[in-house]
């Protein structure tokens, strides 16, 4: 009795993939602090294998082994052990496709919490932990939280650009050739005085 429904689900999946094939997922990479502040959960974890696909919901889930939670203690409550990361099946719908086969490699994962489950996408800030600078690793563990809800990293997308508020910090990595993500790797936008935020060196904290 389940075969017709499975075939129908597969047909729907194929149809949606054809419709969405011309609409590639597109998102600008955020500053790490923005990714931290805008996420419900930030964890360090290892991916434990290939995803399990649910053809009915068009979502797949990756089994993960969390090694440390950096943000989200209050959000998850008693469910402090996150075992799965959910994402759309199709990359055209911003589904995340994990490429690494190394199950011992630790990743920084930022995501949203929906119905008690961790959801990630191709737009999530999700990188191998080892690729972060030591300053960024410290910031994800401690520093970035001080700017959440108070300060805003304001991206400069074209020159000239200007700040819209004293609580904004102008992020210029994307327009300065040769910057090598210098601001992203070494600075955080943090409060200096009430109503004023400035770039602060992560190495100085």
UniProtKB/Swiss-Prot annotation:
Query: Which top-rank group of organisms is this from?
Result: Eukaryota
Q: Which cysteines are joined by disulfide bonds?
A: 25-94, 27-123, 37-148, 151-197, 156-161, 169-189
Q: What induces it?
A: Regulated by tumor promoters and mitogens through protein kinase C. Also induced by viruses.
GO process terms (BP): cartilage development; cellular response to peptide; cellular response to UV-A; connective tissue replacement involved in inflammatory response wound healing; negative regulation of apoptotic process; negative regulation of catalytic activity; negative regulation of endopeptidase activity; negative regulation of membrane protein ectodomain proteolysis
The glycosylation sites annotated in the UniProt record are 54, 102
**Residues with the Phosphoserine modification:** 179
Q: Which UniProt keywords apply?
A: Disulfide bond, Glycoprotein, Growth factor, Metal-binding, Metalloenzyme inhibitor, Metalloprotease inhibitor, Phosphoprotein, Protease inhibitor, Secreted, Signal, Zinc
Per the record, the major location class is secreted
The signal peptide, as residue positions, is 1-24
GO MF terms held by the record? cytokine activity; growth factor activity; metalloendopeptidase inhibitor activity; protease binding; zinc ion binding
Pfam family for this entry, one:
TIMP
Q: How does it assemble?
A: Interacts with MMP1, MMP3, MMP10 and MMP13, but has only very low affinity for MMP14. Interacts with CD63; identified in a complex with CD63 and ITGB1.
In its UniProt entry, the species of origin is given as Mus musculus
Limits of the NTR domain? 25-148
Tell me what this protein is called: Metalloproteinase inhibitor 1
Q: Where in the cell is it found?
A: Secreted
Q: What is the lineage of its organism?
A: Eukaryota, Metazoa, Chordata, Craniata, Vertebrata
Family in the record? Belongs to the protease inhibitor I35 (TIMP) family.
An example Gene Ontology cellular component term from the record? basement membrane
Tissue specificity, please? Found in fetal and adult tissues. Highest levels are found in bone. Also found in lung, ovary and uterus.
Q: Where in this protein does the record put region Involved in metalloproteinase-binding? A: 25-28, 91-92
Q: Could you tell me what this protein does?
A: Metalloproteinase inhibitor that functions by forming one to one complexes with target metalloproteinases, such as collagenases, and irreversibly inactivates them by binding to their catalytic zinc cofactor. Acts on MMP1, MMP2, MMP3, MMP7, MMP8, MMP9, MMP10, MMP11, MMP12, MMP13 and MMP16. Does not act on MMP14. Also functions as a growth factor that regulates cell differentiation, migration and cell death and activates cellular signaling cascades via CD63 and ITGB1. Plays a role in integrin signaling.
Site keyed Involved in metalloproteinase-binding: positions: 38
Binding of Zn(2+), residues: 25
């Amino acid at each position: 009795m389940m075969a017709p429904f499975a075939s129908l689900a597969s047909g729907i999946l194929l149809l949606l993939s054809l419709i969405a094939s011309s609409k590639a997922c597109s998102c600008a990479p955020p500053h790490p602090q923005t990714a931290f502040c805008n996420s419900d959960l930030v964890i360090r974890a290892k991916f434990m294998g290939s995803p399990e696909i649910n053809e009915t919901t068009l979502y797949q889930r990756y089994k993960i082994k969390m090694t440390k939670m950096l943000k989200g203690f209050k959000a998850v409550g008693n469910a402090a052990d996150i075992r799965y990361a959910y994402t759309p099946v199709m990359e055209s719908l911003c589904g995340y496709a994990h490429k690494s086969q190394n199950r011992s490699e630790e990743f920084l994962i930022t995501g949203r919490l929906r119905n008690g489950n961790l959801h990630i996408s191709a737009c999530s800030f999700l990188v191998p932990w080892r690729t972060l600078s030591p300053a960024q690793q410290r910031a994800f563990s401690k520093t970035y939280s001080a700017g959440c809800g108070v300060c805003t990293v304001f991206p400069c997308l074209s020159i000239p650009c200007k700040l819209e508020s004293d609580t904004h910090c102008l992020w210029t990595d994307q327009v300065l050739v040769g910057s090598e993500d210098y601001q992203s790797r070494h600075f955080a936008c943090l409060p200096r005085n009430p109503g004023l935020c400035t770039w602060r060196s992560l190495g100085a904290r």
